[in-house]
Amino acid sequence: MKKSFVGLSVVVITLFLTACAPSKEMQEAKKRDAEFAQAVKSINLETADVGSKPDNSRAIVEAAIRDQLKDPESAKFSEFTEPRKEVMVENRNFVYGYSSCVYVNAKNSYGGYTGKQLYWAFMRNGKVLRVKNTNDAYGNIIFIGRPVNCS
C-alpha cells in the first residue's frame, strides 16, 4: 500500500512539473520577442528608407482623424507638429515614414466638446497609415519599447 502511494505521488508530481514547463509555442514566442527586441535596438532613422516627406501632411492627417470622429465637422485642429522621421510595426515588420502630432477638439456622442486631445499620425509616401489618440489605452506608444514622440 505504501509503495503504491509513493508511486502515485511520483506520477502526480511529475505531471504537475510537466504542466509547469513552458510549452514549445511559448518558447518560440519568447525567441521571436528577443529577436524583435534586438532589431529594435538597431533602428537607424537617418539611414532608413522613410519614403518621401509629405508636403500636405496637415490635410491628410486632418482627413484621417476626421474619419475616426463621431462628429467630423465639429473638429478643431491646433498645434500641428512638423513631420519627423519615425518607425512603426506592421505584422512584425518595421515600416519607416514620418509622424506628426496635433491637438483635436471635437464633439462627442452627446454633442459636447471633448477638450483638446493629442493625436499621433504615421505617414508614408503621402498616405496616413495609422492614427492614434494618445489618451486611449496604449495610445502613447507606437510599439512596446517605442513611445509616441510629439516634440
Cite the ranges covered by each PLM segment.
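Bacterial N-terminal signal peptides that target proteins for export
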Residues: M1-S9
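Classic N-terminal secretory signal peptides
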Residues: V11-T14
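C-terminal motif of bacterial Sec signal peptides marking the signal peptidase cleavage site
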Residues: F16-A19
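Cystatin/cathelin-like cysteine-protease inhibitor module
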Residues: A21-S151
